[in-house]
From Swiss-Prot:
Cellular component aspect of the GO annotation: cytoplasm
UniProt-listed CDD domains: Endonuclease_V
Biological function: DNA repair enzyme involved in the repair of deaminated bases. Selectively cleaves double-stranded DNA at the second phosphodiester bond 3' to a deoxyinosine leaving behind the intact lesion on the nicked DNA.
Site residues, Interaction with target DNA: 80
Membrane-crossing segments per the record: none
Family the entry assigns: Belongs to the endonuclease V family.
Gene3D superfamilies: archaeoglobus fulgidus dsm 4304 superfamily
Protein name: Endonuclease V
Native source organism of the sequence: Aeropyrum pernix (strain ATCC 700893 / DSM 11879 / JCM 9820 / NBRC 100138 / K1)
Length: 255
């Protein structure tokens, strides 16, 4: 596929102001019921083609097995800017999540929740937009200092615990509440979804695997687990018809 530059008007300062306004909608409160399903969201990008791949994987908390998987592929015009990840990734993650056959009890996003310079990372943004409890799971710390406390190591800023660290370097993740959940609940769910011997929660791990695999297919290779391929359904954005054949050849169902 030939490279196509996709440009759009984007103001980082306006986006940051929007985050400050939207964070007023964030509520950190206990879950109303015990969750049974968790949705993992992640996105990957083919820089050569300017295409983003958003993956939404719904898993059972009881078995940690995927029960549904949707992918949305589209051209992306917003650049990567630290702290403003949601404005780039929601363009492909939100349509993937909307295509799922059932709503998740909790959404887990590869990125931060309130452990963010404006207390409104991508997990908080997703939670507010989808109106679902959300958790951020990130591989790097954005703000705060590490302080040891009861139950583990915490990310603390201005006396507030924003996230808890699971694992040890270099195999560690920073778990923070995004919306409609407490830090303790977010940590408990994240721990419960890490398989023995692993270090990443299964919902975001699978979403990461799938989004990167499809990015590889877009780049001209075929590398995807056949079991995942049989589960995932893919929707293409405008003017991406040329991707349908290689995706079908890789065993994916294209809608």
């Amino acid at each position: 596929m030939n490279r196509r530059e996709v440009r759009c008007a984007f103001s980082a300062s306006k986006a940051a102001r929007a985050q400050l306004l939207l964070r007023g909608k964030v509520r950190l409160e206990p879950l109303p019921t015990r969750p049974r399903t968790v949705l993992g969201l992640d996105a990957s990008y083919s820089a050569k083609d300017g295409v983003g791949v958003g993956a939404a994987v719904l898993i059972s908390l009881e078995t940690l097995e995927p029960v549904d998987c949707r992918v949305y592929i589209s051209r992306v015009c917003i650049p990567y800017i630290p702290g403003l990840l949601a404005f780039r990734e929601l363009a492909v993650m939100a349509p993937a999540a909307a295509a799922l056959s059932a709503e998740a009890d909790v959404v887990m996003v590869d990125g931060h929740g309130i452990a963010h310079p404006r207390r409104f990372g991508i997990a908080s943004h997703v939670g507010v937009i989808l109106e679902r409890p959300s958790i951020g799971v990130a591989k790097k710390k954005l703000v705060g200092t590490l302080v040891e406390g009861p139950g583990g190591m915490y990310v603390v800023q201005d006396g507030e615990r924003l996230a808890i660290v699971l694992g040890t370097r270099p195999r560690e993740v920073y778990v923070s509440p995004g919306h409609r959940i407490t830090l303790e609940e977010a940590a408990s769910i994240a721990r419960a979804t890490i398989r023995p011997g692993g270090w990443m929660p299964e919902p975001t791990r699978l979403a990461d695997v799938i989004s990167k695999a499809l990015k590889t297919i877009i780049g001209g290779q075929s590398l995807i687990n056949s079991a995942l391929a049989s589960l995932c359904r893919v929707k293409l954005g405008p003017r991406l018809e040329e991707l349908e054949r290689p995706l079908r050849r890789a065993g994916l169902e294209v809608e």
